[in-house]
Amino acid sequence: MDFDRELDEELEFTKSTKKVKIYPTFESMNLKPELLKGIYNYGFEAPSAIQSRAIMQIIRGRDTIAQAQSGTGKTATFSIGILSSIDTKSKDCQALVLSPTRELAQQIENVIEHLGDYMNVRSHACIGGTQVGEDVKKLQQGQHIISGTPGRVLDMIKRRNIMPRHVKMLVLDEADELLTKGFKEQIYEIYKTLPAGAQVVVVSATLTPEVLEMTNKFTSDPVKILVKRDDVTLKGIKQYYIQCEKEDWKFDTLCDLYDNLTITQAVIFCNTKAKVNWLAGQMRKSNFTVAAMHGDMKQEDRDSIMKEFRSGSTRVLISTDVWARGIDVQQVSLVINYDLPLDKENYVHRIGRSGRFGRKGTAINLLTSQDKDELKSLQHYYSTKIREVPADLSKIM
């Protein structure tokens, strides 16, 4: 992704953020040569807006609260910050990254592994749904960076398989989810085991005032890099709706879309596990090749589905919001909200899948007559315009 100065200046940051120095190239950050090589090898060419502002704040040891759009390189922002601070000569765990889902924790570990490819860095995804014995074995070998879910990481700390006394940095990714959905007590327990003065980095696509208030418990005089609310929705994503009137008419509408659009890969979001299973069954009956994923599935099944989807052997993934946060599949060009999300904050996480790293994407919302008010509410919440699908479907992709 090229650093687009003009596009970068279009992003509206809060007043306090405008005082933060911008580093327009990775070279200007004076990074380790091995890390710089890993960054370029991973495909980055220049920092995104959030990377150009936040990486150096993290490297300097400042507690940092960073908010940016999905797909703008938030994961790489803190990963580069972590890798800059790691002493690979030591076997100690020096950084913990906590995420709300297993898939996101694995994705982060994968990014860290690739960016640190030339650094001899050791990292491990410590997540629930896997054998405890596998974690113990890996942790005993010594891991510099651990990316995990709060429950499993806390369990490993209590078992003394993770020794947090040398941890320099704690990262809370998708902080709005972590701090509001039952993880708060686990995170605070983990935080209390860390050395005094450990750096805390808080990252999310959306940060409500309530979540920002909660971060006071974990941070000390943090630098805040926040975008204005009306810039949270991704630039470059075309947003449309189709008025289906009745729930029963949505499926036929979906089939019509697939008959008329050329789609690389797509994600279809439903609000319940039951509907995911039902819709997958209906599409298979209509000879569509689809995969389905939700939180009730075994971890190995979810891993297998994600592997197939990333490789491109499956072109359509039907999912609940378990997939909405942070899972990066570069080829996704279309997101369809079969149901509007129950939580407005999830809208940006869902549609962000279709425009990764500046590529153009399309989001289509299927509406019943009862969804009209919710659509207006979404548009007001994000200060965005969601247009009706034009008669000529070739114009929307």
UniProtKB/Swiss-Prot annotation:
Residues annotated as binding ATP are: 68-75
- Cellular component, GO annotation: FAL1-SGD1 complex; nucleolus; preribosome, small subunit precursor; small-subunit processome
Question: Catalytic activity, per the record?
Answer: ATP + H2O = ADP + phosphate + H(+)
So what EC number does this one have? 3.6.4.13
Q: Which residues form the Helicase ATP-binding domain?
A: 55-225
Matches recorded under Pfam families: DEAD (PF00270), Helicase_C (PF00271)
Q: Which UniProt keywords apply?
A: ATP-binding, Helicase, Hydrolase, Nucleotide-binding, Nucleus, Ribosome biogenesis, RNA-binding, rRNA processing
**Where, subcellularly, is it found?**
Nucleus, Nucleolus
* Motif Q motif in this chain: 24-52
Q: Identify a single GO molecular function assigned to this protein.
A: RNA binding
Domain Helicase C-terminal spans what residues?
A: 236-397
Question: Which domain of life does the protein's organism represent?
Answer: Eukaryota
Name the residue ranges of motif: DEAD box. 173-176
| Any Gene Ontology biological process | maturation of SSU-rRNA from tricistronic rRNA transcript (SSU-rRNA, 5.8S rRNA, LSU-rRNA)
- Biological role stated in the UniProt entry: ATP-dependent RNA helicase involved in 40S ribosomal subunit biogenesis. Required for the processing and cleavage of 35S pre-rRNA at sites A0, A1, and A2, leading to mature 18S rRNA.
Q: What is known of its domains?
A: The Q motif is unique to and characteristic of the DEAD box family of RNA helicases and controls ATP binding and hydrolysis.
The record's annotation in PANTHER family points to: ATP-DEPENDENT RNA HELICASE DBP3
Family designation: Belongs to the DEAD box helicase family. DDX48/FAL1 subfamily.
- Protein name (record): ATP-dependent RNA helicase FAL1
- What is the species listed in this Swiss-Prot or TrEMBL entry? Meyerozyma guilliermondii (strain ATCC 6260 / CBS 566 / DSM 6381 / JCM 1539 / NBRC 10279 / NRRL Y-324)
